[in-house]
């Protein structure tokens, strides 16, 4: 038995565009864009992103000691050899007990830290408890891993205090994740490590630890042209994070290397000798 479907077959009129052939002619005359002459178009895109990646510079550091975690950073933002800002906030408050640092592309770091803060808050609402530092760093690493090779520029430290005590992790834009007791990230990190490694002790007081962090940032800004501005120091303890200081590195120079007053008579006496 064959169904009669003749009543269902209708011809839809074309309104305002003429015939189908006219429509196809219009599409064929539209401008076209040639693809790059390469067999690996995805690989070409990744290389193109690397070619236009701007130079960046910063100095951030964090270390664990007996009273919690000390976090410090400078505030200079650069675009190649151009200093675009001296007041960038490179230590971001994820929640009252956790901090993140920025090194790399400012937009990438700010976006992913903001995204991490939202997810940490949702975790707290769903589970009735704060997320651990380990869990937050793993969450960020997983998110960045899913975008690896896409041109992101992120080098961050996640520092905080949870039920197990202080925690410190380094996370990069490829999804890498490292646990440690002290890290320094950025173009000024080799200079900061020189001071940090020589002066680090686990049993420091809060005042000693903050001075070590401040001095490490200062010496990095003194040698690294892409670091500068203000040296901000934060402490994360059992009661949450606290900002301890924010000193201009230009003023810190005269704090560590004071200039003795010289009179004109003294200069004349030295010249006579």
Swiss-Prot record:
Gene Ontology biological process terms from the UniProt entry: proteolysis involved in protein catabolic process
Annotated GO MF terms: threonine-type endopeptidase activity
Main location: cytoplasm
Catalysed reactions, semicolon-separated: Cleavage of peptide bonds with very broad specificity
Keyword Ligase: no
Residues at the active site: 58 (nucleophile)
Propeptide: 1-57
GO CC annotations, alphabetized: cytosol; nucleus; proteasome complex; proteasome core complex, beta-subunit complex
Gene3D superfamilies named among the record's database cross-references: Glutamine Phosphoribosylpyrophosphate, subunit 1, domain 1
The protein's Enzyme Commission number: 3.4.25.1
InterPro entries linked: Ntn_hydrolases_N, Pept_T1A_subB, Proteasome_bsu_CS, Proteasome_sua/b, Proteasome_suB-type
Primary enzyme class: hydrolase
A Pfam family assignment: Proteasome
Keywords: Cytoplasm, Hydrolase, Nucleus, Protease, Proteasome, Threonine protease, Zymogen
Superkingdom per UniProt: Eukaryota
Localization terms from the record: Cytoplasm; Nucleus
Stated family: Belongs to the peptidase T1B family.
Biological role stated in the UniProt entry: The proteasome is a multicatalytic proteinase complex which is characterized by its ability to cleave peptides with Arg, Phe, Tyr, Leu, and Glu adjacent to the leaving group at neutral or slightly basic pH. The proteasome has an ATP-dependent proteolytic activity.
UniProt subunit comment: Component of the 20S core complex of the 26S proteasome. The 26S proteasome is composed of a core protease (CP), known as the 20S proteasome, capped at one or both ends by the 19S regulatory particle (RP/PA700). The 20S proteasome core is composed of 28 subunits that are arranged in four stacked rings, resulting in a barrel-shaped structure. The two end rings are each formed by seven alpha subunits, and the two central rings are each formed by seven beta subunits. The catalytic chamber with the active sites is on the inside of the barrel.
Name used for this protein in its record: Proteasome subunit beta type-5-B
């Amino acid at each position: 038995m064959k169904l009669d479907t003749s009543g269902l077959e209708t011809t839809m009129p074309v309104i305002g565009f003429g015939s189908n052939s006219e429509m196809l002619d219009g599409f064929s005359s539209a401008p076209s864009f040639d693809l790059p002459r390469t067999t690996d178009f995805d690989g070409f895109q990744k290389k193109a992103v690397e070619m236009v990646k701007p130079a960046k510079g910063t100095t951030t550091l964090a270390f664990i000691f007996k009273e919690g975690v000390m976090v410090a950073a400078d505030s200079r933002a650069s675009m190649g050899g151009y200093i675009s800002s001296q007041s960038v906030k490179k230590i971001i408050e994820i929640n009252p007990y956790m901090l993140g640092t920025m090194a790399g592309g400012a937009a990438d770091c700010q976006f992913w830290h903001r995204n991490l803060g939202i997810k940490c808050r949702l975790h707290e609402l769903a589970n009735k408890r704060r997320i651990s530092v380990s869990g937050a760093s793993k969450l960020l690493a997983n998110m960045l891993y899913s975008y690896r090779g896409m041109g992101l520029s992120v080098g961050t430290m996640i520092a905080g205090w949870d039920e197990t005590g202080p925690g410190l992790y380094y996370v990069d834009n490829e999804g890498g994740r490292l646990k440690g007791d002290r890290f320094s990230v950025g173009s000024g990190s080799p200079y900061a490590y020189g001071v940090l490694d020589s002066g680090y002790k686990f049993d420091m007081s809060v005042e000693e630890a903050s001075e070590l962090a401040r001095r490490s940032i200062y010496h990095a800004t003194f040698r690294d042209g892409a670091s500068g501005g203000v040296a901000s120091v934060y402490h994360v303890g059992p009661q949450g994070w606290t900002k301890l200081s924010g000193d201009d590195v230009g003023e810190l120079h005269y704090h560590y290397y004071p200039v003795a007053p010289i009179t004109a008579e003294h200069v004349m006496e030295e010249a006579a000798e």
